[in-house]
From Swiss-Prot:
It comes from Mesoplasma florum (strain ATCC 33453 / NBRC 100688 / NCTC 11704 / L1) (Acholeplasma florum). Residues 1-267 are annotated as: Amidoligase domain. One of its GO terms (cellular component) is cytosol. The gene is pyrG. CTPSs have evolved a hybrid strategy for distinguishing between UTP and CTP. The overlapping regions of the product feedback inhibitory and substrate sites recognize a common feature in both compounds, the triphosphate moiety. To differentiate isosteric substrate and product pyrimidine rings, an additional pocket far from the expected kinase/ligase catalytic site, specifically recognizes the cytosine and ribose portions of the product inhibitor. GO terms for biological process: 'de novo' CTP biosynthetic process; pyrimidine nucleobase biosynthetic process. This is CTP synthase. It is an enzyme of class 6 (ligase). The lineage of its organism: Bacteria, Bacillati, Mycoplasmatota, Mollicutes, Entomoplasmatales. Pfam families: CTP_synth_N (PF06418), GATase (PF00117). InterPro entries: Class_I_gatase-like, CTP_synthase, CTP_synthase_N, GATASE, GATase1_CTP_Synthase, P-loop_NTPase. The keyword Ribosomal protein does not apply. ATP binds at residues 14-19, 71. Allosterically activated by GTP, when glutamine is the substrate; GTP has no effect on the reaction when ammonia is the substrate. The allosteric effector GTP functions by stabilizing the protein conformation that binds the tetrahedral intermediate(s) formed during glutamine hydrolysis. Inhibited by the product CTP, via allosteric rather than competitive inhibition.
Protein backbone atom coordinates (compact mmCIF):
# COMPACT_ATOMS: atom_id res chain seq x y z
CA UNK A 1 0.00 0.00 0.00
CA UNK A 2 1.27 3.46 -0.88
CA UNK A 3 2.11 6.06 1.75
CA UNK A 4 1.46 9.79 1.32
CA UNK A 5 3.41 13.00 1.92
CA UNK A 6 1.77 16.41 1.51
CA UNK A 7 3.80 19.61 1.23
CA UNK A 8 2.10 22.92 2.02
CA UNK A 9 3.41 26.48 2.14
CA UNK A 10 2.86 29.41 4.44
CA UNK A 11 3.58 33.12 4.99
CA UNK A 12 4.45 33.97 1.36
CA UNK A 13 4.62 32.20 -1.99
CA UNK A 14 7.84 31.36 -3.80
CA UNK A 15 9.57 29.75 -0.80
CA UNK A 16 10.61 26.61 -2.64
CA UNK A 17 7.90 24.06 -1.84
CA UNK A 18 8.65 22.44 -5.18
CA UNK A 19 12.37 22.14 -4.46
CA UNK A 20 11.62 20.82 -0.96
CA UNK A 21 9.25 18.20 -2.38
CA UNK A 22 11.72 17.33 -5.15
CA UNK A 23 14.58 16.99 -2.67
CA UNK A 24 12.55 14.64 -0.50
CA UNK A 25 11.66 12.61 -3.58
CA UNK A 26 15.35 12.44 -4.45
CA UNK A 27 16.22 11.16 -0.97
CA UNK A 28 13.44 8.59 -0.86
CA UNK A 29 14.41 7.23 -4.26
CA UNK A 30 18.03 7.05 -3.12
CA UNK A 31 16.70 4.97 -0.21
CA UNK A 32 15.37 2.39 -2.65
CA UNK A 33 11.73 3.50 -2.81
CA UNK A 34 9.59 4.08 -5.87
CA UNK A 35 8.33 7.67 -5.77
CA UNK A 36 5.54 9.44 -7.65
CA UNK A 37 4.97 13.19 -7.40
CA UNK A 38 1.96 15.47 -7.89
CA UNK A 39 1.27 19.20 -7.96
CA UNK A 40 -2.16 20.60 -7.09
CA UNK A 41 -2.67 24.20 -8.23
CA UNK A 42 -5.54 26.31 -6.86
CA UNK A 43 -6.06 28.44 -9.97
CA UNK A 44 -9.20 28.00 -12.08
CA UNK A 45 -7.48 27.49 -15.43
CA UNK A 46 -8.02 23.92 -16.59
CA UNK A 47 -4.29 23.52 -17.22
CA UNK A 48 -1.31 25.85 -17.82
CA UNK A 49 -1.45 25.29 -21.59
CA UNK A 50 -3.06 28.61 -22.47
CA UNK A 51 -1.67 30.67 -19.60
CA UNK A 52 0.70 33.57 -20.29
CA UNK A 53 4.38 32.68 -19.80
CA UNK A 54 4.72 36.01 -18.01
CA UNK A 55 2.27 34.86 -15.33
CA UNK A 56 3.01 31.18 -15.08
CA UNK A 57 6.47 30.54 -16.50
CA UNK A 58 7.09 27.58 -18.77
CA UNK A 59 4.60 24.85 -19.53
CA UNK A 60 6.33 21.55 -18.80
CA UNK A 61 5.23 18.70 -21.07
CA UNK A 62 5.12 15.11 -19.84
CA UNK A 63 5.71 12.00 -21.94
CA UNK A 64 1.97 11.36 -22.18
CA UNK A 65 1.25 14.89 -23.42
CA UNK A 66 0.28 16.65 -20.21
CA UNK A 67 0.70 20.44 -20.20
CA UNK A 68 1.76 20.96 -16.62
CA UNK A 69 3.25 23.26 -14.01
CA UNK A 70 6.96 24.05 -14.24
CA UNK A 71 7.51 22.36 -10.86
CA UNK A 72 7.11 19.04 -12.65
CA UNK A 73 10.38 19.82 -14.41
CA UNK A 74 12.07 20.01 -11.02
CA UNK A 75 10.36 16.79 -9.95
CA UNK A 76 11.55 14.87 -13.00
CA UNK A 77 15.09 16.23 -12.84
CA UNK A 78 15.43 15.44 -9.13
CA UNK A 79 13.89 11.96 -9.08
CA UNK A 80 14.77 10.97 -12.68
CA UNK A 81 11.35 9.49 -13.35
CA UNK A 82 8.84 10.14 -16.13
CA UNK A 83 5.72 11.67 -14.65
CA UNK A 84 2.27 11.83 -16.25
CA UNK A 85 -0.79 14.02 -16.70
CA UNK A 86 -1.86 12.70 -13.33
CA UNK A 87 0.99 14.66 -11.77
CA UNK A 88 -0.60 18.06 -12.43
CA UNK A 89 -4.12 18.99 -11.37
CA UNK A 90 -5.68 22.44 -11.12
CA UNK A 91 -8.79 23.57 -9.29
CA UNK A 92 -10.17 24.46 -12.72
CA UNK A 93 -9.83 20.86 -13.88
CA UNK A 94 -11.46 19.56 -10.69
CA UNK A 95 -14.40 21.96 -10.98
CA UNK A 96 -14.81 21.28 -14.71
CA UNK A 97 -14.90 17.52 -14.22
CA UNK A 98 -17.34 17.86 -11.32
CA UNK A 99 -19.70 20.16 -13.22
CA UNK A 100 -19.57 17.95 -16.32
CA UNK A 101 -20.45 14.96 -14.14
CA UNK A 102 -23.41 16.88 -12.72
CA UNK A 103 -24.60 17.80 -16.23
CA UNK A 104 -24.45 14.14 -17.27
CA UNK A 105 -26.56 13.23 -14.26
CA UNK A 106 -23.81 11.21 -12.60
CA UNK A 107 -24.77 12.52 -9.17
CA UNK A 108 -28.38 11.44 -9.42
CA UNK A 109 -29.85 14.83 -8.61
CA UNK A 110 -27.71 15.55 -5.55
CA UNK A 111 -26.89 19.10 -4.48
CA UNK A 112 -23.28 19.56 -5.62
CA UNK A 113 -21.06 21.12 -2.96
CA UNK A 114 -17.38 21.80 -2.28
CA UNK A 115 -17.61 19.23 0.51
CA UNK A 116 -17.96 16.39 -0.33
CA UNK A 117 -17.95 16.52 -4.15
CA UNK A 118 -14.92 18.74 -4.84
CA UNK A 119 -12.90 17.33 -1.95
CA UNK A 120 -13.74 13.77 -2.98
CA UNK A 121 -12.53 14.52 -6.49
CA UNK A 122 -9.23 15.83 -5.10
CA UNK A 123 -8.83 12.74 -2.93
CA UNK A 124 -9.56 10.51 -5.91
CA UNK A 125 -6.70 12.17 -7.83
CA UNK A 126 -4.33 11.24 -5.00
CA UNK A 127 -5.63 7.69 -4.64
CA UNK A 128 -5.68 7.15 -8.40
CA UNK A 129 -2.02 8.19 -8.59
CA UNK A 130 -1.20 5.66 -5.89
CA UNK A 131 -3.09 2.91 -7.69
CA UNK A 132 -1.77 3.47 -11.21
CA UNK A 133 1.83 4.43 -10.45
CA UNK A 134 2.59 1.51 -8.16
CA UNK A 135 4.74 3.86 -6.09
CA UNK A 136 5.72 3.27 -2.49
CA UNK A 137 5.33 6.96 -1.65
CA UNK A 138 3.18 9.65 -3.27
CA UNK A 139 4.48 13.19 -2.67
CA UNK A 140 1.84 15.85 -3.35
CA UNK A 141 2.63 19.56 -3.33
CA UNK A 142 -0.31 21.86 -2.58
CA UNK A 143 0.14 25.09 -4.53
CA UNK A 144 -0.54 28.52 -3.12
CA UNK A 145 -0.28 29.66 0.49
CA UNK A 146 -2.21 28.39 3.50
CA UNK A 147 -5.01 30.85 4.17
CA UNK A 148 -5.76 31.52 0.51
CA UNK A 149 -9.43 30.96 -0.16
CA UNK A 150 -8.63 29.03 -3.34
CA UNK A 151 -6.54 26.45 -1.45
CA UNK A 152 -9.11 25.52 1.18
CA UNK A 153 -10.72 22.57 -0.68
CA UNK A 154 -7.26 21.02 -1.14
CA UNK A 155 -6.37 21.48 2.52
CA UNK A 156 -9.68 19.91 3.55
CA UNK A 157 -9.11 16.99 1.16
CA UNK A 158 -5.68 16.15 2.58
CA UNK A 159 -7.08 16.47 6.12
CA UNK A 160 -9.61 13.81 5.22
CA UNK A 161 -6.92 11.59 3.68
CA UNK A 162 -5.03 11.64 7.00
CA UNK A 163 -8.23 10.64 8.80
CA UNK A 164 -8.84 7.80 6.34
CA UNK A 165 -5.28 6.49 6.14
CA UNK A 166 -3.92 7.16 9.63
CA UNK A 167 -0.90 9.11 10.84
CA UNK A 168 1.44 6.19 10.14
CA UNK A 169 0.58 6.48 6.43
CA UNK A 170 0.49 10.27 5.96
CA UNK A 171 3.08 12.99 6.61
CA UNK A 172 2.39 16.72 6.51
CA UNK A 173 5.36 18.97 5.72
CA UNK A 174 4.90 22.73 6.01
CA UNK A 175 7.34 25.13 4.32
CA UNK A 176 7.35 28.65 5.78
CA UNK A 177 9.52 31.75 5.96
CA UNK A 178 11.83 32.40 8.92
CA UNK A 179 11.82 36.17 8.77
CA UNK A 180 14.98 38.20 9.43
CA UNK A 181 14.64 41.84 10.45
CA UNK A 182 17.70 43.78 9.42
CA UNK A 183 16.81 46.72 11.68
CA UNK A 184 16.96 44.67 14.88
CA UNK A 185 19.36 42.03 13.54
CA UNK A 186 17.17 39.15 14.67
CA UNK A 187 15.03 36.34 13.34
CA UNK A 188 11.29 36.38 13.91
CA UNK A 189 9.36 33.13 14.30
CA UNK A 190 5.94 34.76 14.54
CA UNK A 191 5.09 34.39 10.80
CA UNK A 192 5.74 30.65 11.05
CA UNK A 193 3.69 30.41 14.23
CA UNK A 194 0.75 32.24 12.65
CA UNK A 195 0.96 30.12 9.52
CA UNK A 196 0.85 26.93 11.58
CA UNK A 197 -2.02 28.39 13.62
CA UNK A 198 -3.92 28.86 10.34
CA UNK A 199 -3.21 25.24 9.41
CA UNK A 200 -4.37 24.04 12.81
CA UNK A 201 -7.63 25.95 12.38
CA UNK A 202 -8.17 23.94 9.19
CA UNK A 203 -7.59 20.65 11.00
CA UNK A 204 -3.98 19.95 10.05
CA UNK A 205 -1.07 19.54 12.45
CA UNK A 206 2.19 19.64 10.48
CA UNK A 207 4.64 16.86 11.31
CA UNK A 208 7.70 18.61 9.92
CA UNK A 209 8.39 22.31 9.43
CA UNK A 210 10.88 23.38 6.78
CA UNK A 211 11.85 26.97 7.44
CA UNK A 212 13.25 28.94 4.52
CA UNK A 213 16.17 31.05 5.70
CA UNK A 214 19.49 32.46 4.54
CA UNK A 215 21.57 30.42 7.01
CA UNK A 216 21.18 27.73 9.65
CA UNK A 217 19.01 28.78 12.57
CA UNK A 218 20.04 28.55 16.20
CA UNK A 219 19.00 25.88 18.67
CA UNK A 220 16.90 28.51 20.45
CA UNK A 221 14.94 29.33 17.29
CA UNK A 222 14.17 25.67 16.67
CA UNK A 223 13.12 25.16 20.26
CA UNK A 224 10.76 28.12 20.05
CA UNK A 225 9.15 26.82 16.86
CA UNK A 226 8.94 23.37 18.43
CA UNK A 227 7.15 24.77 21.48
CA UNK A 228 4.59 26.88 19.64
CA UNK A 229 4.00 24.54 16.68
CA UNK A 230 3.65 21.26 18.59
CA UNK A 231 6.49 19.32 16.97
CA UNK A 232 9.83 17.92 18.19
CA UNK A 233 12.86 20.17 17.75
CA UNK A 234 14.39 17.52 15.47
CA UNK A 235 11.47 18.03 13.08
CA UNK A 236 12.38 21.66 12.38
CA UNK A 237 14.47 21.68 9.19
CA UNK A 238 16.41 24.60 7.73
CA UNK A 239 16.08 25.23 3.99
CA UNK A 240 19.03 27.55 3.53
CA UNK A 241 19.97 29.44 0.39
CA UNK A 242 22.39 27.47 -1.81
CA UNK A 243 24.34 28.46 -4.90
CA UNK A 244 22.67 25.63 -6.81
CA UNK A 245 19.25 24.08 -6.24
CA UNK A 246 20.89 20.70 -6.81
CA UNK A 247 22.71 21.05 -3.49
CA UNK A 248 19.42 21.14 -1.57
CA UNK A 249 18.92 17.33 -1.41
CA UNK A 250 22.34 17.00 0.22
CA UNK A 251 21.44 19.74 2.71
CA UNK A 252 18.19 17.94 3.53
CA UNK A 253 20.08 14.64 3.78
CA UNK A 254 22.40 16.13 6.39
CA UNK A 255 19.37 17.20 8.45
CA UNK A 256 17.73 13.77 8.11
CA UNK A 257 14.53 14.93 6.41
CA UNK A 258 14.14 11.54 4.77
CA UNK A 259 14.71 9.74 8.07
CA UNK A 260 11.94 11.71 9.77
CA UNK A 261 9.53 10.84 6.96
CA UNK A 262 10.51 7.16 6.86
CA UNK A 263 10.19 6.82 10.63
CA UNK A 264 6.68 8.25 10.71
CA UNK A 265 5.61 6.15 7.73
CA UNK A 266 7.14 3.09 9.41
CA UNK A 267 9.16 2.22 6.31
CA UNK A 268 12.43 0.34 6.58
CA UNK A 269 14.78 0.84 3.66
CA UNK A 270 18.34 0.19 2.62
CA UNK A 271 20.96 2.82 3.37
CA UNK A 272 20.33 6.03 1.45
CA UNK A 273 22.84 6.09 -1.42
CA UNK A 274 23.67 9.67 -2.43
CA UNK A 275 26.95 8.86 -4.19
CA UNK A 276 25.86 9.74 -7.74
CA UNK A 277 24.20 12.97 -6.55
CA UNK A 278 27.32 13.92 -4.59
CA UNK A 279 29.41 13.41 -7.73
CA UNK A 280 27.01 15.58 -9.72
CA UNK A 281 27.30 18.38 -7.16
CA UNK A 282 31.08 18.02 -7.30
CA UNK A 283 30.84 18.63 -11.05
CA UNK A 284 28.91 21.81 -10.34
CA UNK A 285 31.51 23.07 -7.87
CA UNK A 286 34.32 22.20 -10.29
CA UNK A 287 32.69 24.25 -13.06
CA UNK A 288 34.60 27.52 -12.78
CA UNK A 289 35.12 28.64 -16.38
CA UNK A 290 32.10 30.10 -18.17
CA UNK A 291 30.53 29.31 -21.51
CA UNK A 292 28.24 31.93 -22.99
CA UNK A 293 24.94 31.46 -24.78
CA UNK A 294 23.17 34.29 -26.57
CA UNK A 295 19.53 33.57 -25.82
CA UNK A 296 17.13 35.21 -28.30
CA UNK A 297 13.61 34.89 -26.92
CA UNK A 298 10.16 36.44 -26.66
CA UNK A 299 9.59 36.22 -22.90
CA UNK A 300 13.01 36.98 -21.45
CA UNK A 301 11.62 39.36 -18.80
CA UNK A 302 10.54 36.25 -16.87
CA UNK A 303 13.31 33.70 -17.11
CA UNK A 304 11.07 30.99 -15.61
CA UNK A 305 9.38 30.95 -19.03
CA UNK A 306 12.50 29.06 -20.18
CA UNK A 307 13.28 27.18 -16.97
CA UNK A 308 13.94 23.74 -18.47
CA UNK A 309 16.04 25.20 -21.29
CA UNK A 310 18.20 27.05 -18.76
CA UNK A 311 18.56 23.97 -16.55
CA UNK A 312 19.41 21.82 -19.59
CA UNK A 313 22.17 24.25 -20.58
CA UNK A 314 23.55 24.21 -17.05
CA UNK A 315 23.47 20.41 -16.83
CA UNK A 316 25.22 20.09 -20.21
CA UNK A 317 27.83 22.65 -19.16
CA UNK A 318 28.73 20.68 -16.04
CA UNK A 319 29.80 17.79 -18.29
CA UNK A 320 32.59 20.07 -19.53
CA UNK A 321 33.25 21.73 -16.15
CA UNK A 322 31.75 24.96 -17.44
CA UNK A 323 29.14 27.20 -15.85
CA UNK A 324 26.48 28.97 -17.86
CA UNK A 325 26.47 32.65 -18.70
CA UNK A 326 23.45 33.89 -20.65
CA UNK A 327 23.37 36.99 -22.82
CA UNK A 328 19.65 37.74 -22.98
CA UNK A 329 18.35 39.32 -26.20
CA UNK A 330 14.75 40.45 -26.63
CA UNK A 331 13.83 39.14 -30.08
CA UNK A 332 11.68 42.11 -31.07
CA UNK A 333 14.62 44.47 -30.45
CA UNK A 334 16.66 42.89 -33.27
CA UNK A 335 16.32 44.35 -36.76
CA UNK A 336 18.22 44.67 -40.02
CA UNK A 337 20.07 47.76 -38.86
CA UNK A 338 21.41 46.43 -35.55
CA UNK A 339 21.51 42.62 -35.51
CA UNK A 340 25.11 42.27 -36.69
CA UNK A 341 26.37 44.68 -34.04
CA UNK A 342 24.25 43.14 -31.27
CA UNK A 343 25.31 39.58 -32.12
CA UNK A 344 28.93 40.20 -33.13
CA UNK A 345 30.39 38.69 -29.94
CA UNK A 346 28.01 35.71 -29.72
CA UNK A 347 29.70 32.39 -28.91
CA UNK A 348 26.56 30.33 -29.38
CA UNK A 349 22.98 31.31 -30.24
CA UNK A 350 19.84 29.61 -28.98
CA UNK A 351 16.31 30.40 -30.13
CA UNK A 352 13.69 28.62 -27.95
CA UNK A 353 10.01 27.85 -28.42
CA UNK A 354 7.18 30.35 -28.37
CA UNK A 355 3.90 31.34 -29.97
CA UNK A 356 2.71 34.34 -31.98
CA UNK A 357 4.39 36.69 -34.44
CA UNK A 358 6.05 39.12 -32.02
CA UNK A 359 9.83 39.05 -32.42
CA UNK A 360 9.82 36.56 -35.29
CA UNK A 361 11.87 38.68 -37.68
CA UNK A 362 14.47 39.25 -34.96
CA UNK A 363 14.74 35.50 -34.41
CA UNK A 364 15.12 34.93 -38.15
CA UNK A 365 18.00 37.41 -38.20
CA UNK A 366 19.64 35.68 -35.22
CA UNK A 367 19.55 32.29 -36.95
CA UNK A 368 20.84 33.87 -40.18
CA UNK A 369 23.76 35.43 -38.29
CA UNK A 370 24.67 32.09 -36.69
CA UNK A 371 24.42 30.30 -40.03
CA UNK A 372 26.55 32.78 -41.95
CA UNK A 373 29.21 33.23 -39.26
CA UNK A 374 29.78 29.61 -38.17
CA UNK A 375 28.39 30.24 -34.70
CA UNK A 376 26.89 27.19 -32.95
CA UNK A 377 23.10 27.38 -33.15
CA UNK A 378 20.35 25.41 -31.45
CA UNK A 379 16.75 26.06 -32.49
CA UNK A 380 13.98 24.53 -30.40
CA UNK A 381 10.47 24.18 -31.86
CA UNK A 382 9.87 27.78 -33.01
CA UNK A 383 13.66 28.16 -33.19
CA UNK A 384 13.80 25.30 -35.69
CA UNK A 385 10.95 26.79 -37.71
CA UNK A 386 12.44 30.27 -38.03
CA UNK A 387 15.85 28.80 -38.96
CA UNK A 388 14.21 26.86 -41.80
CA UNK A 389 12.26 29.93 -42.92
CA UNK A 390 15.48 31.97 -42.95
CA UNK A 391 17.20 29.35 -45.11
CA UNK A 392 14.24 29.20 -47.51
CA UNK A 393 14.27 32.98 -47.91
CA UNK A 394 17.99 33.08 -48.69
CA UNK A 395 18.67 29.82 -50.53
CA UNK A 396 15.43 29.50 -52.50
CA UNK A 397 15.09 33.24 -53.13
CA UNK A 398 11.69 33.29 -51.43
CA UNK A 399 11.60 36.58 -49.48
CA UNK A 400 7.94 35.97 -48.54
CA UNK A 401 8.69 32.57 -46.98
CA UNK A 402 6.96 32.28 -43.62
CA UNK A 403 4.64 30.23 -41.44
CA UNK A 404 0.87 30.53 -41.58
CA UNK A 405 1.11 31.28 -37.85
CA UNK A 406 2.68 34.64 -38.73
CA UNK A 407 1.44 35.23 -42.29
CA UNK A 408 -2.21 34.28 -42.48
CA UNK A 409 -2.30 34.82 -46.24
CA UNK A 410 -0.19 31.70 -46.63
CA UNK A 411 1.67 33.11 -49.64
CA UNK A 412 4.77 30.94 -49.11
CA UNK A 413 3.89 28.62 -46.21
CA UNK A 414 7.12 26.87 -45.21
CA UNK A 415 5.21 25.84 -42.08
CA UNK A 416 1.48 25.19 -41.91
CA UNK A 417 -1.14 23.80 -39.54
CA UNK A 418 -0.63 20.17 -38.62
CA UNK A 419 -3.03 18.12 -40.69
CA UNK A 420 -6.12 17.08 -38.76
CA UNK A 421 -5.81 19.74 -36.04
CA UNK A 422 -8.98 21.67 -35.10
CA UNK A 423 -7.83 25.27 -34.58
CA UNK A 424 -11.08 26.76 -33.29
CA UNK A 425 -9.80 26.67 -29.69
CA UNK A 426 -6.32 27.30 -28.31
CA UNK A 427 -6.59 24.70 -25.55
CA UNK A 428 -6.14 21.06 -26.53
CA UNK A 429 -5.13 21.74 -30.16
CA UNK A 430 -1.42 20.97 -29.96
CA UNK A 431 0.68 17.98 -30.92
CA UNK A 432 1.80 16.94 -27.46
CA UNK A 433 3.97 14.34 -25.78
CA UNK A 434 6.50 11.70 -26.78
CA UNK A 435 4.25 9.38 -28.78
CA UNK A 436 6.06 10.05 -32.05
CA UNK A 437 9.11 8.03 -33.07
CA UNK A 438 11.74 10.14 -34.80
CA UNK A 439 13.77 8.15 -37.32
CA UNK A 440 17.24 9.66 -37.66
CA UNK A 441 19.12 9.67 -40.94
CA UNK A 442 22.32 7.65 -41.00
CA UNK A 443 25.61 9.56 -40.98
CA UNK A 444 24.14 12.81 -39.66
CA UNK A 445 25.16 14.92 -36.71
CA UNK A 446 21.87 13.96 -35.03
CA UNK A 447 22.77 10.26 -35.27
CA UNK A 448 26.21 10.94 -33.85
CA UNK A 449 24.76 12.93 -30.95
CA UNK A 450 22.05 10.42 -30.03
CA UNK A 451 24.03 7.30 -30.86
CA UNK A 452 20.79 5.86 -32.20
CA UNK A 453 18.60 5.84 -35.31
CA UNK A 454 15.36 6.10 -33.32
CA UNK A 455 14.39 8.52 -30.54
CA UNK A 456 11.24 9.61 -28.73
CA UNK A 457 11.12 13.24 -27.62
CA UNK A 458 8.37 15.50 -26.29
CA UNK A 459 6.42 17.87 -28.52
CA UNK A 460 4.29 20.97 -28.09
CA UNK A 461 3.34 22.64 -31.37
CA UNK A 462 0.51 23.02 -33.89
CA UNK A 463 2.50 23.83 -37.05
CA UNK A 464 4.55 21.47 -39.22
CA UNK A 465 7.07 21.78 -42.03
CA UNK A 466 5.46 21.91 -45.48
CA UNK A 467 6.98 19.01 -47.42
CA UNK A 468 6.34 20.77 -50.74
CA UNK A 469 9.60 22.65 -50.09
CA UNK A 470 11.61 19.67 -48.83
CA UNK A 471 13.24 18.59 -52.09
CA UNK A 472 14.29 22.12 -53.08
CA UNK A 473 15.88 22.75 -49.68
CA UNK A 474 17.64 19.38 -49.71
CA UNK A 475 19.12 20.18 -53.12
CA UNK A 476 20.54 23.39 -51.64
CA UNK A 477 22.18 21.50 -48.77
CA UNK A 478 19.74 21.50 -45.84
CA UNK A 479 19.66 18.09 -44.18
CA UNK A 480 16.38 16.81 -42.77
CA UNK A 481 18.01 14.42 -40.34
CA UNK A 482 14.98 13.38 -38.28
CA UNK A 483 11.55 12.37 -39.62
CA UNK A 484 8.36 11.07 -38.03
CA UNK A 485 7.89 8.49 -40.76
CA UNK A 486 4.26 7.64 -40.03
CA UNK A 487 3.11 11.09 -41.15
CA UNK A 488 6.32 12.29 -42.83
CA UNK A 489 6.73 15.15 -40.36
CA UNK A 490 10.13 16.83 -40.16
CA UNK A 491 11.58 16.60 -36.64
CA UNK A 492 15.25 17.63 -37.01
CA UNK A 493 17.15 19.84 -39.44
CA UNK A 494 20.90 20.43 -39.60
CA UNK A 495 23.66 21.92 -41.71
CA UNK A 496 26.49 19.47 -42.42
CA UNK A 497 29.29 21.99 -43.02
CA UNK A 498 28.81 24.05 -39.89
CA UNK A 499 30.29 23.69 -36.37
CA UNK A 500 26.78 23.10 -35.03
CA UNK A 501 23.54 24.20 -36.65
CA UNK A 502 20.68 22.01 -35.45
CA UNK A 503 16.96 22.59 -35.04
CA UNK A 504 14.41 20.27 -33.48
CA UNK A 505 10.64 20.50 -33.81
CA UNK A 506 10.39 18.82 -30.41
CA UNK A 507 11.53 20.12 -27.01
CA UNK A 508 14.75 18.36 -25.91
CA UNK A 509 14.86 20.41 -22.69
CA UNK A 510 12.14 18.27 -21.13
CA UNK A 511 14.31 15.15 -21.02
CA UNK A 512 17.61 16.53 -19.70
CA UNK A 513 18.58 15.11 -16.31
CA UNK A 514 21.47 15.66 -13.89
CA UNK A 515 24.37 13.53 -15.15
CA UNK A 516 22.32 12.83 -18.33
CA UNK A 517 22.00 15.98 -20.47
CA UNK A 518 19.89 15.66 -23.59
CA UNK A 519 22.26 14.95 -26.53
CA UNK A 520 21.28 18.12 -28.43
CA UNK A 521 22.22 20.31 -25.47
CA UNK A 522 25.43 18.40 -24.86
CA UNK A 523 26.40 18.73 -28.52
CA UNK A 524 25.52 22.44 -28.57
CA UNK A 525 27.57 23.22 -25.46
CA UNK A 526 30.49 21.13 -26.69
CA UNK A 527 30.47 23.08 -29.96
CA UNK A 528 30.56 26.38 -28.06
CA UNK A 529 33.42 25.19 -25.85
CA UNK A 530 35.43 23.94 -28.85
CA UNK A 531 34.56 26.69 -31.33
CA UNK A 532 37.48 29.12 -31.55
Amino acid sequence: MAKFVFVTGGVVSGLGKGITASSLGNLLKASGLKVFMQKFDPYLNVDPGTMSPYQHGEVFVTDDGGETDLDLGHYERFIDEKLTKMSSTSAGKIYLETINAERRGDWGGQTIQVVPHITDSIKNKVYQAAKTSGADVIISEIGGTVGDIESQPFIEAIRQIRMEQGKENVVFIHVALLLYLNASKEYKTKPIQMSVKELLSLGIQPDIIVQRTDKHSSKEIKEKISLFCNIPTSNVIDAIDKESIYEVPLEMYEQNLHGLVLDQLQIRTKKTDMESWIKFCEKIKASKEEFEVTFVGKYIELQDAYLSVIESLKIAGYEFKRKLKINWIQADKLNESNYKEVLQNAKGILVPGGFGDRGIEGMILASKFARENSIPYLGICLGMQIATISIARDWLNLPEANSTEFDHSGAVPIFDFIRGIDVQNLGGTLRLGAFYKTTIKEGTKAEKLYGSREVFERHRHRYEFNNEYKKALEEKGLVFSGIYEEKKLVEIIELPNHPFFVGSQYHPEFTSRPNKPNPLFKGFVEAIVNNK
